[in-house]
């Protein structure tokens, strides 16, 4: 989740229930994303709100994480409220928009 973005940020920590993979993807932590995937975490897992790691990385501008997740089989067409591409477009993440459109 990105501050001041389309995706609503919870008012307090009790409302925040990110999975490990979504958390690391939203932080741009490539090594931690790789470790989570190596430990068997489903690349398409979502948090309680249906927010995926690919959506998190795309919205927050982490192209390296987006590419890694796609290489590992992330569903680029998955749509919770928005697709990863739609979130990248709303957040004006140009490189990620171009990459996702090229797939």
Regions of interest found by a model, annotated:
Residues 32, 64-65, 95-96:
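Conserved ankyrin/ankyrin-like repeat signature
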Residues 1-39:
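Intrinsically disordered, low-complexity regulatory segments in ankyrin-centric signaling systems
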């Amino acid at each position: 989740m990105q501050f001041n973005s389309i995706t609503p940020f919870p008012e307090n920590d009790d409302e925040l229930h990110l999975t490990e993979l979504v958390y690391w993807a939203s932080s741009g932590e490539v090594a931690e994303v790789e470790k989570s995937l190596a430990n068997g975490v489903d690349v398409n897992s979502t948090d309680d709100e249906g927010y995926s790691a690919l959506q998190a990385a795309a919205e927050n501008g982490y192209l390296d994480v987006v590419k890694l997740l796609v290489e590992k089989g992330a569903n680029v067409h998955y749509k919770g409220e928005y697709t990863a591409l739609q979130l990248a477009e709303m957040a004006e993440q140009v490189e990620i928009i171009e990459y996702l459109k090229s797939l």
